[in-house]
């Protein structure tokens, strides 16, 4: 019986590496792929950060694939990523909203490119290291939370279509993170099994989105400078550093002392004001 070919999305981290190990043990033929999405050299953080967009991670993914015995390709999609994910990310902040770039990436970039690459490389399926499962009901597929609820990633995948799900494998869906680390250790990857996890946005490995906006938006400081904090009656409470520096629900880091906790409940780009209230919602 001919082996099914799987396009394995490799990040160089423990999850995609263990996912690849499991698929190989199940008899699949793997083709690895890592997409170069963003060049952090422009932000001066390549040397100090090891985010999934770094050159280090690209070559770590290739090294893991080679050690496990399957071919691996690095594909450059930086322009597409910038035009879609980064443009949306910047645009949402400038409209006073907080973006979720992972959802945008999964729906418009990642799965689309994976399916496209899988077709080009004659792969039957694609696989990732997400902690998620796929269920079946009434002839349709649906996303299920991963067995490890603390690592469940279905929220970022809610936009996947029936076609996407029909071609997707989630080898880690039934496992906990502890079990994944143990598998890596048992396969001789002790260092990988102890590797920490990144919680940052992949193209902002230092988690400083404010500096990122200032670097990416022309004349940012002049266009999005200081404005006013106001209360629900319109009374001025103090000055802020520019509305894109704040998010709905934010309480800490406002830079003003009001004698009681205050939350950002609305952001108005049109007049550069941030509305504050004593609870996260005026209905509370």
Enumerate the language-model features and the residues they cover.
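Conserved small/polar residues in nucleotide/adenosyl-binding loops
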Residues: 277-284
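Short, charged/polar, Gly/Pro-enriched secondary-structure boundary elements
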Residues: 151-152, 209-214, 283
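ATP-dependent adenylation/nucleotidyltransferase module used to activate substrates
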Residues: 1-158, 169, 177-180, 185, ...
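A generic structural motif
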Residues: 272-276
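Oxyanion-binding "anion nests"
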Residues: 228-232, 236-250, 255, 267
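Short acidic-glycine loop/turn motifs at beta-strand connectors
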Residues: 135-140, 231-233, 268-271
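Contiguous mid-protein beta-loop-alpha structural module that forms a pocket-lining wall or clamp
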Residues: 162-232, 238-240
């Amino acid at each position: 019986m001919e082996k099914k070919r799987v396009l394995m999305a490799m990040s160089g981290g423990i999850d995609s590496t263990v996912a690849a190990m499991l698929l190989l043990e199940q008899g699949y033929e793997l083709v690895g792929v890592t997409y170069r999405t963003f060049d952090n050299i422009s932000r001066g953080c390549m040397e100090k950060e090891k985010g999934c967009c770094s050159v280090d991670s690209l070559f770590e993914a290739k090294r893991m694939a080679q050690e496990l015995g399957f071919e691996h390709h690095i594909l450059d999609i930086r322009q597409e990523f910038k035009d879609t994910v980064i443009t949306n990310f910047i645009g949402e902040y400038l409209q006073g909203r907080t973006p979720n770039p992972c959802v945008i990436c999964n729906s418009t970039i990642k799965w689309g490119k994976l399916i496209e690459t899988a077709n080009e490389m004659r792969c039957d399926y694609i696989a990732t290291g997400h902690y998620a499962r796929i269920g079946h009901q009434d002839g349709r597929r649906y996303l299920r939370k991963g067995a490890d609820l603390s690592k469940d990633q279905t929220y970022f995948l809610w936009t996947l279509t029936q076609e996407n799900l029909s071609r997707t494998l989630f080898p880690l869906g039934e496992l906990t993170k502890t079990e994944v680390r143990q598998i890596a250790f048992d396969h001789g990857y002790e260092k990988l099994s102890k590797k920490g996890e990144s919680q940052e946005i992949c193209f902002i490995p230092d988690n400083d989105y404010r500096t990122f906006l200032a670097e990416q938006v022309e004349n940012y400081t002049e266009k999005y400078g200081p404005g006013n904090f106001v209360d629900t009656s319109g009374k001025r409470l103090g000055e802020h550093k520019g509305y894109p520096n704040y998010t709905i629900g934010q309480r800490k880091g406002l830079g003003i002392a009001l004698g009681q906790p205050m939350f950002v409940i609305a952001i108005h780009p049109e007049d550069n004001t941030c509305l504050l209230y004593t609870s996260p919602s005026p209905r509370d």
